A protein has these predicted regions:
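A short, Trp-centered hydrophobic/proline-enriched beta-strand micro-motif
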Residues: 150-160
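Glycine-rich phosphate/cofactor-binding loops in nucleotide/flavin-utilizing enzymes
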Residues: 9-10, 17-23, 379-447, 457-458, ...
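Amphipathic, small/basic residue-rich leader segments at the start of a protein or domain
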Residues: 1-123, 140-150, 446-535
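Glycine-rich phosphate/pyrophosphate-binding beta-alpha loops
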Residues: 112, 189-195, 398-401
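Glycine-rich beta->alpha junctions and the first turn(s) of the following alpha-helix
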Residues: 232, 236-327, 396-407, 414-483
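N-terminal glycine-rich flavin-associated loop
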Residues: 119-139, 165-168, 302
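C-terminal helix-coil-helix/basic helical segment that borders enzyme active sites and/or dimer interfaces
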Residues: 63-64, 328-361, 374-375
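A short core secondary-structure module
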Residues: 185-230
């Protein structure tokens, strides 16, 4: 039988054993002081970084902390006292204005110290505060956003269902009008901050006489209210990101009509706008994390001696460090791109190419950098209380949630091929030369990409092509960062590394001969029968 409890306003879940449920710090009283939102951003971010350093480098054992479930009661409370989530809220609701570059910088500072905490704030910002601020009714925005900052609330998003993850448009959670309220029924799982969040954005399809409708509705659910409690049926033993609780939730709530988000056109377009903006903000999380891994790896390679010389003196190690350094530079370039193209004043529902290329690239780099750090650390890194081991398991789900990377790569390729059909262009290089996301980077591949593409490719080819195209787009953003005056040596290094990656990916794309699964593969496949007796 699954353990069952309901979340309350303080996020407690008393029916669950403490070993199974994450600890949410008690919230300060409503009269708690809120930092001055009008302070210059340099003052704000330096104060925030200082608080993070004080907590993670002096007051807690960060390695042990991130290997445990939940957070110490004081930690999130003290961090929230610097009001980091105010960067996602408009000034009229007590925030700093909702500027994208401020949110990215806040996430970068957080990610350097703790990837789990960084994701916690990313969930609150991109998946709750930004959509509520953009699509919420005036009454909902005034009430929810002001209380969110004043009372140190937490918010999250529930889309995924046990049988509908990637297939979210066929979700089974439904809503129907009930007087001046909406009744919502269904099951959601893998929503980050399960049992913690005070507010949820719930997604559902309208129940009609013919079954669930095609469009998606979004509703703000305030679990502090009696008719809006969400039952937590099970808390999952997630492998990584252990400070964030995940689980399965039974939804049977009634919310006021005013708490339904108001799309500009359709709910599906609103969902795409929300998800694309969230994916475009992944560099905020990746940059700080990648910087930390680079710093730690460099320190280790300078201090660790093998064969009478430091690890950093070995050629293969130098190549690894250069690649990790390139990841940081390109992730920063993507932050620049997002800060100028990802604002809530824009409709991002049609920006799948940039959003998918950004999300897939930076999350692949996060995992690759983690694997490199772990490899160089050797056995001592293979522990949950060591940054190398923890980074490897913590970064892995970033390649899965908000769109599995292989599916997103396929979508990148399909989008480009669709545009090529419209332009009646079959040569990949010529097409990329004309596209704003690839024009300058395409010149690095005049020969490599100058071939006609079959516009009806099998899925495996689409995935390989999409990965290569995503790296070309990454190069374009890196070129732009360089032209703004960023360090030329770091730009050249990043472009060199990505150029090599694209060459390798294109080779894989153009290689034939990959077969599918051979049926009945267990028959006649025992190698022992082929052992020859010694003479």
């Amino acid at each position: 039988m699954p353990l069952t409890t309901s979340t309350s306003g303080d996020g407690s879940a008393s029916a669950l054993p403490t070993a199974r449920i994450s600890r949410k710090p008690s919230e300060p009283a409503a009269s708690a002081s809120v930092p001055d939102a009008s302070a210059p951003f340099t003052t704000f971010i330096e104060r925030y970084r200082a608080k993070l350093r004080d907590l993670f480098e002096r007051r807690v054992d960060a390695d042990a902390l991130n290997a445990q479930r939940g957070l110490p009661p004081f930690l999130l409370r003290e961090i929230r006292d610097t009001d980091p989530l105010s960067v996602y809220v408009a000034e009229e609701h007590g925030g700093r204005g909702g500027h994208i570059h401020e949110g990215l910088a806040m996430l970068e500072a957080t990610g350097y110290e703790s990837l789990g905490l960084c994701l916690t704030f990313g969930i609150n910002g991109a998946l709750f505060l930004q959509p509520v601020g953009k699509y919420g009714s005036d009454d909902t925005k005034t009430d929810v956003l002001q209380r969110f900052l004043r009372d140190r609330r937490l918010g999250g998003l529930m889309i995924t269902e046990p049988d509908h993850g990637t297939d979210a448009l066929n979700m089974r959670t439904t809503f129907e009008a009930d007087g001046e309220r909406y009744r919502i029924h269904g099951t959601k799982h893998w929503g980050g901050l399960t049992g913690w969040a005070d507010y949820w954005l719930l997604t559902a399809r309208e129940q009609t006489a013919k079954g669930p409708g095609r469009d998606i509705g979004f509703f703000v659910c305030d679990v502090t209210q009696p008719e809006q409690h969400i039952e937590v049926e099970e808390v999952y033993e997630n492998l990584g990101l252990r400070i964030i609780p995940y689980g399965r939730n039974q939804i049977d709530v009634s919310v006021p009509q005013a708490q339904r988000l108001e799309p500009d056109s359709t709910g599906i377009k609103m969902m795409l706008d929300l998800l694309h903006r969230s994916r475009m903000q992944f560099p905020g999380m990746s940059t700080g994390f990648l910087r930390r891994l680079l710093d730690e790896t460099v320190d280790h390679c300078r201090e660790r001696f093998v064969g009478g010389k430091p690890l950093e003196a070995y050629d293969n190690v130098k190549a690894t460090l250069a690649k990790m350094q390139a990841y940081v530079t390109s992730s920063r370039a993507m932050s620049l791109f997002t800060s100028e193209h990802g604002g809530t004043d824009r409709d991002l529902s049609g920006m799948s190419l940039a959003a998918n290329a950004i999300k897939t690239s930076v999350t692949d780099w996060m995992q690759q950098a983690s694997q490199s750090f772990l490899q160089l650390c050797g056995a001592k890194g293979y522990r949950m209380d060591h940054l190398a081991g923890r980074a490897t398991v913590d970064s892995r789900p970033f390649q899965i949630f908000e769109g599995a990377n292989d599916i997103l790569y396929q979508q990148v390729a399909e989008a480009v091929l669709k545009q090529m059909r419209r332009a009646k262009e079959s040569n990949l290089y010529r097409f990329l030369q004309q596209d704003d996301l690839t024009a300058r980077a395409a010149d690095y591949f005049r020969e490599t990409l100058s071939f006609d593409v079959d516009l009806s490719l099998p899925q495996r080819k689409l995935v390989a092509l999409g990965e290569a195209l995503s790296r070309v787009m990454s190069m374009e953003m890196t070129i732009e960062l360089g032209e703004r005056g960023y360090r030329a040596d770091l730009i050249e290094q990043a472009l060199t590394e990505m150029h090599a990656d694209v060459q390798e990916l294109v080779t894989r794309f153009r290689t034939d001969g990959v077969q599918g699964l051979i049926d009945d593969y267990r028959a006649s496949s025992d190698w022992l029968q082929f052992v020859q007796a010694r003479p």
